[in-house]
Amino acid sequence: HTGYIFVNMKNSIFFCLRDSSGTIWEDYLQHPFVQSVGNGSLSENSFKYYLIQDYLFLIQFSRAYALAAYKSETLEDMRSAVAAMSNIIDFEIQLHIKYCSSWGLTLDDLSGKCEDIATTAYTRFVIECGHRGDLLDLMTALAPCVVGYAEIGRKLAESPTLDQKLNPFKSWIEMYSGEEYQKIAASAIHQLQTLFEKRGGPNRYNSLSSIFNQATRLEIEFWEMAWKQQE
């Protein structure tokens, strides 16, 4: 069971931001796209569109971590950013390409497509947060994706409606509910907390909350983008 990783973090800045977001966070976690992945009813067309856009998304997120390295003020933060970028480029994207091939998508299918407007809007918002702000702003913008997928994966894996044998998205759920990804999310929460303690404070909370909420809304739009392919 992977939930233990988050037990001692409930008072951290991440959970304060999440819990003060109103219905936005639950709308993200409970979007029809997510629910349809959980019960196996999502159309193949919708999921393939998501996979293509997620490939393009990952490329831009690796750039966000390159920016994080530039914005870092300590070697520890710089190493963390470089490790995250390397993980996306050398590991996560390669895994994604391999997973996409199981859905009949080639590398040409992935790289030959244009970014959806939702993909561009989300990724450029994150990068812009890093350009105009500091590392805390950038990590806050990244948090809904990194940590949100861990929470979604965990909830779907624990759902009584998950058909372990017949759900075609079972391996996707296992990837984000697995201990390895859960630890990545926990590390992101810890880093955000460390940055907040160094650079945060009450005067920054409202601006961080605004960044967090907007990034979460853009996550919802990313789901919605793929969900519309059902129609």
Residue ranges and their predicted role:
Residues R18-S43, F61, I189-K198:
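Short alpha-helical hairpin
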Residues G178-F212:
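Long amphipathic all-alpha helical oligomerization modules
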Residues N206-E231:
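Acidic, carboxylate-rich catalytic segments that either coordinate divalent cations
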